[in-house]
Amino acid sequence: MSSALAPVGIFDSGVGGLTVARAIIDQLPDEHIIYVGDTGHGPYGPLSIPEVRAHALAIGDDLVGRGVKALVIACNTASAACLRDARERYEVPVVEVILPAVRRAVATTRNGRIGVIGTQATINSHAYQDAFAAARDTEITAVACPRFVDFVERGVTSGRQVLGLAEGYLEPLQRAQVDTLVLGCTHYPLLSGLIQLAMGDNVTLVSSAEETAKEVLRVLAERDLLHPHPDDPRAAGPSRVFEATGDPEAFTRLAARFLGPAVSGVRPVHHVRID
């Protein structure tokens, strides 16, 4: 049985999931976290579903083996590829990023026209389209924006080139007159300014990061797994461990640019391997 003192495990294909980690830190400041960025194998978007599933479950096995009390799949592509497998495989609760964003989008839309942007793998999986199927009176337009992740992973989140790319990708959503747009990749909030500029102020952006953090809070509270208040004698100050399967120095530089000094001393993970 998991302990409330155990950490929350979070993973993504790279730095995008740090938007989820940041939201969890903001909403649950007392929690210990372990974050793994799979920069050695990501981005996941161009990979096949079996490849994504294998990489994601290898990291999940590692984190669960280290005793995390909950596992957060902070990656839309991985959520689409392996959520069912992960929930069958692990005894700890598994939180993903798709359904929380879908619920918020349905609650937000005024005209029922909702857009979704994501990696090619996420859009091809129809995970969002299927998740929206239960919502009545909604019209979903899904568009793949594969190059967004490459720009974010290189630290390029502004400039004419990225704005031009955004305008091209998002034009079908403007034609569809969506009033709510789901950022269906955890990298995309780092481009939210450009995306908002391209879509216009009348479109509401829904970030899966904030909604996922709320879901983590709900799940931990339901299972009495919230970390004790700092005044509790059992409690210790929160620890935040960041690891990368690729170059830890490159990960640190990029992550610190977005999240500041909270991300430092990133540890390399050499034992996360695919058989």
Curated annotation (Swiss-Prot):
| Single GO MF descriptor | glutamate racemase activity
What EC number(s) would the UniProt record show?
Answer: 5.1.1.3
What top-level branch of life does the organism fall under? Bacteria
Q: Tell me the route in metabolism or biology where this protein functions.
A: Cell wall biogenesis; peptidoglycan biosynthesis
- Where substrate binds, per the record, is at 12-13, 44-45, 76-77, 186-187
The active site consists of 75 (proton donor/acceptor), 185 (proton donor/acceptor)
Enzyme superclass (EC): isomerase
Q: Which UniProt keywords apply?
A: Cell shape, Cell wall biogenesis/degradation, Isomerase, Peptidoglycan synthesis
**Reaction catalysed by this enzyme:** L-glutamate = D-glutamate
Q: Which Gene3D superfamilies match?
A: 3.40.50.1860
Listed GO biological process terms: cell wall organization; peptidoglycan biosynthetic process; regulation of cell shape
Q: Does the keyword Isomerase apply?
A: yes
**What family is this?**
Belongs to the aspartate/glutamate racemases family.
Q: Briefly, what is this protein's role?
A: Provides the (R)-glutamate required for cell wall biosynthesis.
- Entries under HAMAP family matching the protein: Glu_racemase
Name under which the protein is recorded:
Glutamate racemase
- UniProt source species: Mycolicibacterium paratuberculosis (strain ATCC BAA-968 / K-10) (Mycobacterium paratuberculosis)
The gene behind this protein is murI
